[in-house]
Amino acid sequence: MDWETLKTDCLACQRCPLHTTRHNVVFGQGVENAEVLFVGEGPGQSEDEQGLPFVGRSGQLLDKYLFAIDLDRASNCYIANIVKCRPPQNRDPLSLIHI
């Protein structure tokens, strides 16, 4: 499966109950063939609203840390979450949602 097909499949996914409450599917962001990958658990409210990973307070802190070690999500790393849709109230995903 190529990258665009994977992204298209994620954007259309309705395999678990999270698709009923999401605003956006939060796919990864950054360089697709990056040597450095950061993976979070699931998107929060800010990420769900913007459709981008790690854009809330945690993301702002992560960007500062990345800058300190000469990394950034636009040029040399990739940032994603295991779960692509926000669990309601930012709770842990249910076992139904786990892969």
Task: State each model region's role.
Residues M1-I97:
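A polyanion-binding, active-site-adjacent surface
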